[in-house]
């Protein structure tokens, strides 16, 4: 399929409006509006540390066993999707995975779709897509719908995120899994 070269920013919903206003006033007054030293509500509560190789290996093993994981690392994210820093992770091949997450974890409607994270080098192995989609904003066909029921929406599509070494620890976790 031929697709247009289109860039969609990760904050294409209402949260992007406030960023636009802040940037407008920053330029208007030619000064920084906020101190960029950290997130004011959490920075003092959390001692930053990176996942160790052991943590990544153990997390990958738990995912392989079918456990649902809360993954919290790195900087916070903006936009409508969790992108590997504040994410709920689960195997994509669990038959009732969508139902489990929607009813027991997220407490939302049964029909809500899920995204998937895939290494950029492997995206065309699983989806009708080539190239980057780092923010889960493009809908594409899942190539093997039967093998990945947890990420396949009722219409056979998914909104995957391509992951690169730019998100080093999440990238390592996917490789280990």
PLM-predicted stretches and their roles:
Residues 1-177:
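Flexible beta->alpha loop and helix N-cap segments adjacent to enzyme active/binding sites
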């Amino acid at each position: 399929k031929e697709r247009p070269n289109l860039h969609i920013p990760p904050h294409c919903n209402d949260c992007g409006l406030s960023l636009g206003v802040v940037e407008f006033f920053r330029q208007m007054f030619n000064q920084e509006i906020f101190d960029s030293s950290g997130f004011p509500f959490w920075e003092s509560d959390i001692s930053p540390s990176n996942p160790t190789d052991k943590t990544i290996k153990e997390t990958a093993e738990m995912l392989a066993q079918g456990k649902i994981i809360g993954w919290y690392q790195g900087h916070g994210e903006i936009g409508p999707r969790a992108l590997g820093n504040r994410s709920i992770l689960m195997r994509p091949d669990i038959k009732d995975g969508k139902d489990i997450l929607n009813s027991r974890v997220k407490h939302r409607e049964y029909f809500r779709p899920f995204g998937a994270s895939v290494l950029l080098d492997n995206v065309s192995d699983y989806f009708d897509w080539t190239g980057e989609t780092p923010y889960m904003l493009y809908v594409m066909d899942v190539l093997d719908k039967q093998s990945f029921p947890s990420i396949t929406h009722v219409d056979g599509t998914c909104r995957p995120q391509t992951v690169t070494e730019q998100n080093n620890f999440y990238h390592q976790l996917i490789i280990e899994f």
